[in-house]
């Protein structure tokens, strides 16, 4: 996760884990790293106990927040500041996430892709890609194998926000799936959070 803050801001968010199947119960380490590379917070979240986390930003910029739920489901929410999910150059993994994810298409962009796939045998998702005006660009259900929405804009982007809606698939198992933004900044923002651009 990235979260943007000005020097002196008090940044807060909630963290929690939920058990998945027979994976072992485990605490979740959370680390916040400043733009300079300095670690400003290290905290451990007890298993299945929602925890409020906060820190004072020592400098202005984007802070990297890392959390590892192991094989279990984890969630960071209720952000006080603009944030985005990032795979730091890799795909972002979701588990049974239903909702909208917003992303920014920068000024001048003409071509980008949204690549998705399920994990393992038969795990998938239903996905709908929406234009900035809310019009549906494309939709696919029971997305198990790799699929890519390929977007070629008629005119270069003026800087716009697109959305990806994910929901339970019609016939595939509803568990793990991945999202990989191609040709644009790999930053996804869940609905309800302020967009980091």
Roles of regions detected by a PLM:
Residues 1-197:
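Acidic, Ser/Thr/Pro
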């Amino acid at each position: 996760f990235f979260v943007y803050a000005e020097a002196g801001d008090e940044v807060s968010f909630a963290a929690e884990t939920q058990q998945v199947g027979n994976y072992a119960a485990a605490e979740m380490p959370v680390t916040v790293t400043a733009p300079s590379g300095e670690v400003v917070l290290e905290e451990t979240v007890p298993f299945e106990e929602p925890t409020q986390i906060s820190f004072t930003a020592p400098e202005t910029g984007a802070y990297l927040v890392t959390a590892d739920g192991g094989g279990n489901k984890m969630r960071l929410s209720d952000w006080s500041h603009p944030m985005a999910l990032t795979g730091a150059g890799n795909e972002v993994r979701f588990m049974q996430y239903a909702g909208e994810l917003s992303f920014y298409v920068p000024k001048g962009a003409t071509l980008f892709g949204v690549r998705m796939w399920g994990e393992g045998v038969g795990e998938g998702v239903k996905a709908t890609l929406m234009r900035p005006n809310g019009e549906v660009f494309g939709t696919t259900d029971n997305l198990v194998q790799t699929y890519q929405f390929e977007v070629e804009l008629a005119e270069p982007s003026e800087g716009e926000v697109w959305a990806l809606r994910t929901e339970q698939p019609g016939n595939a198992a509803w568990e793990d799936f991945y999202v990989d933004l191609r040709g644009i900044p790999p930053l996804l923002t869940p609905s309800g959070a302020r967009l980091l651009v």
